[in-house]
Structure formats: structure tokens, C-alpha cells
Amino acid sequence: MTQHDNDPAWPDHKPTALLVLADGTVLEGFGLGAEGHAVGEVCFNTAMTGYEEILTDPSYAGQLITFTFPHIGNVGTNEEDIETVNMAATPGARGVILRTAITDPSNYRATKHLDAWLKARGIIGLSGIDTRALTALIRSKGMPNAVIAHARNGEFDLHGLKEEAREWPGLEGMDLVPMVTSGQRFTWDETPWLWDKGFGQQDKTEFNVVAIDYGIKRNILRLLAGVGCKVTVVPATTSAEDILAMKPDGVFLSNGPGDPAATGKYAVPVIRDVIKSGTPTFGICLGHQMLGLAVGAKTKKMHQGHHGANHPVKDETTGKVEITSMNHGFAVDEKTLPKGATQTHISLFDGSNCGIQLDGKPVFSVQYHPEASPGPRDSHYLFQRFAELMRQKKSA
């Protein structure tokens, strides 16, 4: 699928990187980032900006990201746009697939070239393939398992790579949260970015919030802090007893990678106990899916997933449409939602479930990412909604 004959933009030598799909298809290109190989599920992301935030989102653990936008790397990288909280954990995405070579950065905030940044984080990259054709393949056949490999000398064990891609079990049934969750409890007090000041620092708090870290993003924590939450982040395996002993005004269920049904084996009982306590609860992404499991619904693997910063979502309670940022390959099966759990939001792309509210309880969640980073800010109000639920509970 490489078509670089007579193209001066590409070097005239043998490929230095491969993408080997589980069905035996081999895509040849040119390597960037770290050398080596990695196995994962190939998805595509349609965002035109925010590649650093995407590549450091822990929800992408176990995945190889195909960027549909052709110009990736043109604003460089910096330390402020990283979304990973646990820097000792997996870097998020296992590989990156691009149409064109990375250009030199041109942005006043850039501190490092994307290629050097990928090398430093151990992320393998591949450029020079027809990403439109790869995206079309994913849309028609679903997200394939694959191995991405980079060797500067262009020498590969093709048989071994094909076998590894074929034998990898895939994300279904896989609990990846232990790879990304924080190993210990910590507090967070950084607030959202202001154009002329940068990130702020909390000076006062109104609520005590416990955030369960299934792979939480920094901008979620900033927005919680921005609405007056003193946020204590706890590891994913923290018990309900320990959480409730902290006397939280609210509990937050974070985003994260992998199959919610697998993570739910230890997370769902905790969530059920939190709900029973009457504590206001807000979930995002994986947290939303596990809230669904906690009330008796089921989750399902999606055909191509939702990955991008331009996904329209309808709020069925108001009729309002929000443009949202999404990153998920599993979804709550709306047909299995029990009585007492109301569907509040749906995707206008495919009608899949994007929100739940528990009737008569201060508990709600959304499938998409209201914190964006990257993406639009249409849904920032949900953090205010969470704060209002806690305020009402405290004054009752």
C-alpha cells in the first residue's frame, strides 16, 4: 500500500517499518520514533490537533493509533500537554501510524520534535502508508490486531511478526487498568489553563472528592479542581470501605483502557457500594461503562470504536447537541439498561449509548470526554453539574 515511486519526499531505499495485520496483510513504510516492535489493536483517530494529548491518554493502552489527518507533528511537543498522570506507567498508545513524515515543528510552545519525543517514550512509529485505505479497511472489517515494527536496517522476521499478530488475543476480555493506574494515593490541586497565566493553583476548596484512577487524564483532574474539588486520587483496586472512610462529598469514576467487563470484576462491587451509600457519583468513559455494569447493564465491543474530537452527541433530556471528544472501543448496550437507569445521551453517528442517569439518585455518567484535551469544550458544564449534586447533598 505504499506508493512513493518517483516521489522526492520519500527516501529511495527499502522500508524501515512494517504494519503486519493478523490476517497476514503487510503494509510497508518508514520508521520513526523508537525501534522495536509492539502488538496492539489498530484504531483510527480523526482529530486534526492534539496529537500529544491523544498519544499520552492512558485509555489508548494496547492500541496502535492511525491518524487520519496528514500533518502530525507540525507543532512539536511540550511537557504541559501530556495527559498521563502516572509517568511510571505505560505511555498509552503502543504505536502511531502516519501518512507523511514528521515535519519540523513551528510553535512557540514546542520544546521537542515529535520524533525525538516518541523515541524518549518508547513509542514505535510508521509513516508513508495510505492511511485513508487503512481507515477504510477498519470501517469495513473492524479494528484489526496487528504488530508495528521499526528497524533502521530494514531487516524483519516477517514470519514471527505475522505469528505474533495472529496469536495476540485482542482487547476483548483484557484488563489493562493495572498497567496505567497510580500505585498510591495522592492529591491534585492544579486548575485549568488560562491563556495569559498557564495552569493555575487551587486557593480554596468546597468539596472533598475521591477519584478512582482507572487511567485518569490530567485535564479531568484540573476541571474537578476548577469547580472547587479537593481531589484525592486513589488506585483502581481501592476498596469501597477505604473510599467511604475518607468521607467524600463525591466519587469520580475515571476513564481508562481495556474491556470494562474484565476490569469490572473488581471495580463493579466497589461502585455498587458507593452508589448504595448515596454519595454523588460521576463517571467518564470506562467509568461510565462500569457504572452501567454496576446497575445490571451489559457492555459490548464496537465495530470500529469512536476516536476523535468532532463527535456529535444528543442530550435526550434537553434536545441539545454537543460536539464532543471520544475515545472508546466498547460501549454500554442500551438495550440492557435496567429500570431505574435512564439513557440521557446518544451518539448521532450510530445511536450508541453515551450517557446514563440513575433515577432518584445523584449518580450520572457519560461515555465521551467532557474534559476534551484535545477537543471542544461544549461539555464542561458536566463538572458544574457534579458540583451542584454535591452541593445539594451537603445542604440536605
Swiss-Prot record:
Binding-site positions, L-glutamine: S59, G256, G258, L286, Q289, N327, G329, F330
Keyword Phosphoprotein: no
Family, as annotated: Belongs to the CarA family.
Top EC class, one word: ligase
PANTHER family per UniProt: CARBAMOYL-PHOSPHATE SYNTHASE SMALL CHAIN (PTHR43418:SF7), MULTIFUNCTIONAL TRYPTOPHAN BIOSYNTHESIS PROTEIN-RELATED (PTHR43418)
Organism phylogeny: Bacteria, Pseudomonadati, Pseudomonadota, Alphaproteobacteria, Hyphomicrobiales
UniProt key word Oxidoreductase: no
Species whose genome carries this gene: Bradyrhizobium diazoefficiens (strain JCM 10833 / BCRC 13528 / IAM 13628 / NBRC 14792 / USDA 110)
GO biological process: 'de novo' pyrimidine nucleobase biosynthetic process; 'de novo' UMP biosynthetic process; glutamine metabolic process; L-arginine biosynthetic process
GO cellular component, one term: cytoplasm
NCBIfam families attached to this UniProt entry: CPSaseIIsmall, PRK12838.1
Name of the protein described by the UniProt record: Carbamoyl phosphate synthase small chain
Enzyme Commission number(s): 6.3.5.5
A molecular function (GO) term: ATP binding
Domain of life: Bacteria
